[in-house]
Structures are given as C-alpha cells and as structure tokens.
Curated annotation (Swiss-Prot):
Enzyme Commission no: 2.3.3.13
Family: Belongs to the alpha-IPM synthase/homocitrate synthase family. LeuA type 1 subfamily.
Domain Pyruvate carboxyltransferase per the UniProt entry, residue ranges: 5-267
Catalytic reaction list: 3-methyl-2-oxobutanoate + acetyl-CoA + H2O = (2S)-2-isopropylmalate + CoA + H(+)
Name recorded for this polypeptide: 2-isopropylmalate synthase
UniProt region (Regulatory domain), positions on chain: 391-509
Pathways involved: Amino-acid biosynthesis; L-leucine biosynthesis; L-leucine from 3-methyl-2-oxobutanoate: step 1/4
Binding site for Mn(2+): 14, 202, 204, 238
Organism: Staphylococcus aureus (strain bovine RF122 / ET3-1)
Alphabetic keyword roster: Amino-acid biosynthesis, Branched-chain amino acid biosynthesis, Cytoplasm, Leucine biosynthesis, Manganese, Metal-binding, Transferase
Lineage: Bacteria, Bacillati, Bacillota, Bacilli, Bacillales
Length: 509
C-alpha cells in the first residue's frame, strides 16, 4: 500500500516572487480555488505581514476554501505571527509557517545573530505560535548550508516548542540528491518527539535539481513536498509540483508513495498559472508542455500507433489532456458550442455563454476550424476582460508618413465611461502604447513583449504578454485576439488596468 505524500503549494507566495509576476486579488482567489480543485493539501496563500494587499488576499482565501489548509508565512516576530492568525482564523484548517535563517552566512551577514540567539528566537516564537495555532510549521532557512549538528539543534528546539511540521528548505538550490536525503535521514533519526512530526522538503532549482532533490527527500523520510505549479519562483524557480506528483505516480514501484492530487486537473491548473503569471510553459516542459505527448520521429510514431506504451509512460488523459479533439466550425450552433464547453471541463452559465458564442462565431468566420485551444483562449481572454477595471473598446490605426503610425484608442471602464486618446509612433505598437499611456496618464517602461500563436497556421489567434514598469512597480498584461495589434493593445490596457486596480485597493485602505 502506498504512503501518502502531502502537497504544500506555495505558488501564491514563493511563486509570486518570480520577476515580473504580480497576481491581482481576483487572480489569487481563482488560483486558490483551482488548487483546491486539484487537491493540494496545503496552500501557502501569502505573507500577511508584508502588505495590506497580501493580508487581504490571504484572508479572502481563508474564508473561501472549504477543504484545503490555508497557511501564512511569518518571520520569527510576534507581529508577523499575529498577522497570520488574523488573516487565517476563519480558515477550515489554519496553519502558520514560521521561519528563521540558520546558515553561517545568513547569521553573520543578514541576521547579525549568534547560534544561541537563533535557538532562543526559535523557542520563543514557535511557543508563541503554538498558543494560536494547532498546526505550526517551522523552517530553518538555508538549511542545506547549515552545519548538520546545529540544524539538528534548531529542529529539536522547534519540535520541543510545539512545531508539528518541520520544513527543510534548500533555499538557494545548493544541495544534491544523496546529501539532501541524508539530511532527512539524520533529522528523522535524531530529533525526538512524543507527537508525530511531518518532515517537508522545499527545493529551489538553481542547479536544475529541485524535483530530483524533492524525490530524494521522500527516500530520506519526508512526507510533504513544497513547490509551485510549473516550477515558477524566485531566480530559477521551485520544484514543479506536477513533475513530483507524476514521478510518484508512474514510479510507484520504486517510491511506494502517492499524492492525493486529482491528476486530471493538472493541465488546467498549469494553464491557469501560466496565463495569470504571464509565463508561457515551454513546449518541451515535462508533463504539461505542448510536446509532452507529441511524437515527431517516424519510428516513434509507428510504435505509438501500434501500442502507445512503446513510447509513452503515461497517458495524456491522466493529466487532463484530450487527444480526441473534434474541432468546431462556422456552421456549429449554440448547442454544439455548449456541449464543447462541458467536454472541456467548463461550467459556464447560459448568460456568459451567449457572449462567448459571439466571440466563437467571430473567430469561426475567419478560420476553417476552431480547435480546443482556440476555445480555451476565448474563455481565457473573456475572463481577463471581465475582471479588468478597463477594457479595449476600439482601436484605429493610420499610416502617417516616413514610417510613422497614428493610433486612436478607446477604452471603457466597468461603469461604462469612455476614455479616448491618440498618439503617433515609429510603428503601430509604439503608437498604440503611447496612446494608452496618455489615456491612463502614466509614464511606463516596457520590460517585456511576447507574441505566441494559440494554434498552428496563419489564421491562428495571437496571444500577447507584456510586462510594464509603472511608478517602480512591475505589472503584466495578457491579450488574445485574431489580430496581433488588437491583442497587443488588450494586453497593454490590462497591465494599466491592473496597476489602477491595485491603487484603488490601496486608496480604500
């Protein structure tokens, strides 16, 4: 019988530390709901003491989820722990995650503390946290560069003070398979407690070993894995949870352990994070990449046609990828469209379907067939526009002279107010973005601009991601349209709308 490996998702906390990623309040809530549907055991919803926005989003998630534990991060500071308590007290299963650095380099250069000071702080703050929470998780930051005897002391101190979960972070992705497994074996054999202690692994991917090290931790005695969807996170990212989960599933003969994830929700969860983070999943990404179940070689294709297991160790359907796609066309009606939405796993009310069907027909008039990926894109684009404070109404372009283009942009807010401005620029994109900047009266710096095609062919929809720097803050925007310039404008407007929305939240505080 397989043992249960808990999944601790930190996409909303560590994942959001990815450069250029800044989830909105609504996006955080939608992500949390999808993570619960995916079946993760714990969601680290944020760092409540870091900002009012983080506190409110953690609080909203705690009040919304019904089965998943909601965790908040806290330094060894009572005010941090209090903030987590206030934010998560309405959760079905509230958890506090207390941490302090323990490696020599952190003690000397960051904390300016001795080992004795650190041990005293662990005892004081874990004891305090235990008075407020049934479940207290403790992490010795930079554990893999901490002397092992001192690490054992830190863990024992935390356990004695009431911690029931001990997380061992490979904070800078420094460790390797055997070393990391040895740390867990040492801790499980050395630290003693009358209560059951869950050991957890948290790996970064600086050397490309986050998933491998996470699996090594299980071999060493870990019963919880921390990570993010698609492996997003600071620097090179975190362990990709979908890869850990499928490795355990496929190689259960070796690990003898399984997660409780609803694996069929894996691809949908990955796509959601990719969309909101503005980070496209590489085509060759394990488990969720577009090429994960593609076979280019003639020998491979022949083998798969004869027997799928010749070159596939798991089925696409296992992770929610449909391989029996029936495209729709311009003659498809509302009923066929509604049935397609159901088949793709969407539960959308009839009123919303009316607008989606109009968008579908507009695309169907321009394409020979509308694929499942086109349908997903329509829904994604509609969700983005529905959530935004502002959306693109119309865009007009005109060639002026000497390479200059003129753009007239009309934007509408949720109350129906219209905003219009125009500008010129050296090319269509520059003209469009100058006009949008004038509407929002903000100076911006375009950090990143990416175009991807939703499907193959010259008639494919365009998917545009932008990252802007506005008043020192990075925001991302996303736009989908059959026309590249329309998609580019939608993405830029959405980025401005996100910045405006966050400023409205701050004013309301």
């Amino acid at each position: 019988m397989s043992s249960h490996i808990q999944i601790f998702d930190t996409t909303l906390r560590d994942g959001e530390q990815t450069p250029g990623v800044n989830f909105t309040f609504d996006e955080r809530l939608r992500i949390a709901l999808q993570l619960e549907k995916w079946g993760v055991d714990v969601i680290e919803a944020g760092f409540p003491a870091s900002s009012t926005g983080s506190f409110k989003s953690v609080q909203a998630i705690a009040q919304t989820l019904t089965t998943t534990a909601v965790c908040g991060l806290a330094r060894c500071k009572k005010s941090d722990i209090d903030a987590v308590y206030e934010a998560t007290k309405d959760a079905a299963k509230p958890v506090v995650h207390v941490f302090i650095a323990t490696s020599p380099i952190h003690l000397e250069h960051k904390l300016k503390m001795s080992q004795e000071d650190v041990l005293a702080s662990i005892k004081e703050h874990v004891t305090y946290a235990k008075q407020l929470f049934d479940v207290v998780q403790f992490s010795p930051e930079d554990a893999t560069r901490t002397e092992l005897p001192f690490l054992v002391k830190c863990v024992q101190t935390a356990v004695d003070a009431g911690a029931t979960v001990i997380n061992i972070p490979d904070t800078v992705g420094y460790s390797y398979h055997d070393e990391y497994a040895h740390i867990f074996k040492t801790l499980t054999e050395s630290a003693t407690s009358s209560n059951e202690i869950i050991y957890s692994a948290h790996c970064h991917d600086d050397l490309g070993m986050a998933v491998s090290n996470s699996l090594a931790a299980i071999e060493g005695g870990a019963r919880r894995i921390e990570g993010t969807v698609n492996g997003i996170g600071e620097r090179a990212g975190n362990a990709a949870l979908e890869e850990v989960a499928l490795a355990l599933y496929v190689r259960n003969d070796h690990y003898g352990a399984q997660t409780a994830l609803n694996l069929e929700e894996t691809k949908k969860t990955s796509d959601l994070i990719s969309r909101y983070a503005g980070i496209r999943v590489p085509r060759n990404k394990a488990i969720v990449g577009q090429n994960a179940f593609s076979h280019e070689s003639g020998i491979h294709q022949d083998g798969v046609l004869k027997h799928r297991e010749t070159y596939e160790i798991m089925t696409p359907q296992l992770v929610g990828v449909s391989m029996t796609e029936l495209p729709l066309g311009k003659l498809s009606g509302k009923h066929a469209f509604s049935e397609k939405l159901k088949a793709l796993g969407y539960d959308i009310d009839k009123e919303a379907q009316i607008d989606l069907f109009k968008q579908f027909k507009a695309i169907a008039d321009k394409k020979k067939s509308v694929s499942d990926r086109d349908i997903h894109a329509i829904i994604q684009g509609s969700e983005h526009e529905h959530q935004a404070l502002y959306k693109l109404e119309t865009l007009q372009l005109q060639y002026v002279s000497s390479g200059l283009q003129s753009a007239v942009v009309v934007v509408k807010d949720k109350e129906g107010h219209i905003y219009q401005d125009s500008s010129i620029g050296t090319g269509s994109i520059v003209a469009i973005y100058n006009a949008v900047d004038r509407i929002f009266q903000k100076e911006t710096e375009l950090i990143d601009y990416r175009i991807n095609s939703v499907t193959e062919g010259t008639d494919a929809q365009a998917e545009v991601h932008v990252n802007l720097l506005i008043e020192g803050k990075t925001v991302n925007g996303f736009g989908i349209d059959h026309d590249i310039l329309q998609a580019s404008c939608k993405a830029y407007v959405e980025a401005h709308a996100k910045f405006a929305a966050e400023n409205v939240e701050k004013v309301g505080n």
